[in-house]
Amino acid sequence: MDGYVTRRLWLDRDPQALKDWQTLMQAAKLSDQERVDYTIGIYDGARLAATGSLDGKILKCLVVCAAYQSENLLTQVVMALLERLDQEGLTNRFVYTKPKNLPYFKALGFRLLAQTEALLFMEQGFPSFQDYLSYLTQHKVDSSQNGAIVMNANPFTLGHRYLVEQALSACGHLYIFVVSEDRSYFSAQDRFKMVQAGVADLANVTVLPSRDYMVSQATFPSYFLKERADLAVAQVQAELDAQVFKQFIAPSLEIAVRFVGEEPLSPVTQVYNQALAQAFGQDLDLKIIPRLEKDGQVISATRVRAAIQAGKLADWVNLVPQSTYHYIQSQDLLGQDVQREKVE
C-alpha cells in the first residue's frame, strides 16, 4: 500500500473531496445522490482510487477506479468501514452488491440473505436474520389462513384501521409488521404503540416489529425518499424486499396472503406493490384493498402529518382513531421536537 493514503471524505464540507467522489461514482455508473453519513477514500497522490460509504450500518457506494482493480483496494475500504462500525458498537451490518461479488463478501464473513438478477443482499454479525426468524416463530399462531400487513403507520389512521378490518375479514389470523426504521415523523416506538392501541380491541391480530428485514433502509431505502426516489432503483430494491418476505418471513409464520392498500398517491409504493405481485407469483396471494376516503379524499398519513404540522387539529382529528389522537396528545407529540421530516 506504499504511496496510498486512506482518509475520511467530508462530502458535506470539502468541495474537492465531493468532486473527486462524484467523479468516481459516475465513472462506475452509480448514483452520486445516495444517502451516506460516513465516507472514506483511498488516494494515490491527488487521485481518488477507491471509496466506500456507510449509511447507518449499511455498506454502500463501494467503488474502485478501473486503473486500480488489481491493487486489492476494495478489501482495504471494506475493512476500514467494518472497523468504523465496530467502533460505533454496530455488530450487525449489511451490504448491497452485485452477484459477481458473492465470493468476495462471503470470504469476509457475510451471509447471503436474498438475491435478484441485479442485486445481492448480505449480512454480517449479530443479531442475525436467523435470530429474527426465531423471534417470529415464537409468536406464531396456529390458524387455517394467516395473513400479513406491513405498515409504517406514521401515524396510525382510520385508513390503516380499515385495511386491518378488511384483511381480518379474509383471514383467520393477521400479523401486522410495523416498520422499525427510525426515519419518519413519528419514532418507531411511537408508531408501534399507536398500532398496538389502534387494534387492541380486535381478536386474532399480532403486532410485530419489522426490524431490518422489511421496508427498511437495508432492504428498501427508496421508500424513505418518496417522490425523490429513482423509480428504476426503487424497482430493483422492491424486488429484493419482496423476495425476503416470500422466501423467509412468510414461511416462518405460514403466511398465505399479504394485504396492501391501493396506492393512488405514491409512485414508490405503487412500484413496491407491483414488485410484490411479481415476486409472489402463484406462491403467495396478494390482495390489494381500496383506500378509505373521507370528504372525497383518500385518508393518508401524509394528509394527517400535513395538518399536524400546520396546527390544524380539526383537519386531522377525524382522520385517526381515538386511540391515535389520545396517544399523540398524552405523549406531547405535537411539538416541533418530534418533527423528523418536513411534509413537502
What do these predicted ranges mean?
Residues 37, 59, 144:
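Short coil/loop residues immediately preceding or within conserved phosphate-binding loops
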Residues 85-98:
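Conserved GNAT acetyl-CoA-binding A-motif
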Residues 36-50:
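Conserved beta-hairpin
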Residues 96-344:
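Nucleotidyltransferase catalytic core that binds NTPs
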Residues 1-32:
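Short amphipathic alpha-helix that is part of the acyltransferase structural core
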